[in-house]
Structures are given as structure tokens and as C-alpha cells.
């Protein structure tokens, strides 16, 4: 049997178009998708228009069926170890958000440090996420709360269940109803997110900004959110499907270098139990280089948050909180000192949460409890509870 090259027809071009849409449902690199598409185009030339269109339709139907199966069976959830990544999405105004109007319960088997470093320390727990219509972790939409909490994954409560969030402790224990605008990012993201919130709700709220010692001290550049073009918005429809997310995760796992993050985990024994620390955050905590305003530019960032910004809170790394059991030498405090200086220049009050977290760590240790997850970089329910008490005390001074 000999193969003969067929002249391209309308059916051939339709087959190419349909097959390209089917391939976009797979989260593979562009180079791989293009290679497969070129191979299909070559095969279609020999198959003829009708056969090519039938094959393309079969590929599209198969992709749609796979997408349904992955969604219906929960396979997509199985590739994520916590809701933080599973529910992550993007918004043209706010940037990173969670999937809006979603409630999800997941058995989180381990934290981010165990995921990165495989240190053998695991604290499994149930994690419930509930999001509002904007895609932030609130039980209801914004309804005029006086305070809006802005910050990264610690403010958002990345590894914690909904009832343990700062906003929940503040509302239930201290009768201060606040709104959670937290999501992983840096100072650029906090400014953009706050401005987007102002566009929606005006200036009749006060911003409490949470700055994390571990990864928030990067330069503020005034970077705005790039507005996606028509092609990017179209491709985002594919990226939101279960099949794309599932295959993308499988690809990343297969291409991940073995042992790439194994050196990131520092395991120490505290209170008779193993606790893991992120070496990068340990290095940040031990930094003795003076941080300069002409490098980080936090002052214009704080100015950009006016007139809403009312208070800044400094969140220490887990290593700083537990340093008294690990290091015999006093730690430097360059991040706090810089933030204090920048806040003073911007005329915004700032408060350090380190002392209350350290005191609670001392109090809880004899009971075998901690204020940060032993397998994660984030604080746990104990940490957010004691932090909320201090936050409530400070915010009360800003209430009429």
C-alpha cells in the first residue's frame, strides 16, 4: 500500500484548527505542542480531508472526555498537596486570587517544607478553604468592614483551615470584623491589589499591611499588572481546565530535577520533636547587611497605599521565633529595622509581632505545641490566634 500526498482542502484546514484546540487542553510546553501539531499536519496531508477531520474530531472528543473524567473522579485534586495551589487563579485587576465562590475541604498530608525537602516531618490536618466572589478567603463578600488585611500567604493562611485565619480570630474572639485580601506576592502585588480594591469599594476602609520577613523584602518597582491580550485571555480558558492543570503538573514533576530542593530543609529537634526550617529564610534571618531604601523603595510603596493604610505588622520567620532553642548568638534584625525606618518616613505606624509569637512559643512548648507548623514555613492556628490578639489590641487604637 502506497501513501500519496493529498491536496489541502477546506476539511484539512478545519482538521488543523480543531486539532490545535484539542492540543491546547494539554499543559505541555509550547515546543512539544507545536511538534505534535506539525506531525499531525503531515499525517493529515496523506490521510485526506475527510479522514483528517474525523481524526481531529476524535482527538478533541478524547480530550474533552479526559477533562471530564479528571474533574469528576477528583484526579485533579490528587496532584496537589494543599488547596493553596489547587485553587490558585488569576484576575486582570487583582492579579493572583483563589477560585471565586468556592468551598473546598482537603486532607493536607504535609507542609511546603516537606514538599520541597522531603525531610520526613509531616503534620497532616484537614484544611478548609472558602472564598468570596472576588476570590479571597472570606465567608462572605465585603460588606463595609472597617479594616482590610493585606499581605502574602501568611495573611491568607496558606496552610491553615478557614476557622484559623486572622480574620476569623479577630471576628469571633475580638468582635472586629475584617476583610482578608491576602494572597502570595510582594510589595508590588500588595499595592496593585489594594488599588484594585479601592476601585471597587472606594476609600472608606483602613488597610492593615502584613510584611513577612522571609520573602517580602524585595524591591518595590511600581510594577503594574499587565493586561492580557485577546490571545492570552483565550488561552487562559484552556489553562483553567482540569486536563490542562493535571497534565501540566505531571509534566513539571517529570521534568523536576531529582534532589533539587533537598538541601533547602534544615531539620532541628525542638521540644522533643523534629522541626523543619527553610534554609533560605534562615539566611534571611541571619542577614547582617543593612537594607537600604535606595534599593528596596518601600517608602513610595507605603505612600501609594495612602490614604487607606493605617497600620503595618511585621511577621517574623519561624527560625527567628525558635532561635532561642537553636542559636546561642543574638540574631541581627535588619528586616525589622529597615521596615521601621521606612514606615517612619512614610508616617505609618508599624508593629513587630515577634515578641508575642516568641512568648507563645515558650508557653506552648512544654505542652508539645508550636506556633508554626513543624513541616511548613507558615504559622499554624496557635500562631494566628496569638497574633490576632495582638493585632486586635493594636487595631483598637485606630477605631473611633
Locate each region found by the language model:
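Structural motif
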Residues: 185-196
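Short catalytic/ligand-binding loop motif for oxyanion handling, primarily in non-cytosolic enzymes
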Residues: 156-158, 187-189, 216-221, 319-324, ...
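Membrane/wall-proximal cationic-aromatic binding patches
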Residues: 74-176, 192, 256-291, 296-303, ...
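Substrate-gating cap/lid alpha-helix
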Residues: 52-58, 65, 318-354
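N-terminal secretory targeting modules
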Residues: 1-146, 204, 217-222, 226-227
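Histidine-centered active-site loop/cap adjacent to the catalytic His
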Residues: 3-8, 371-400
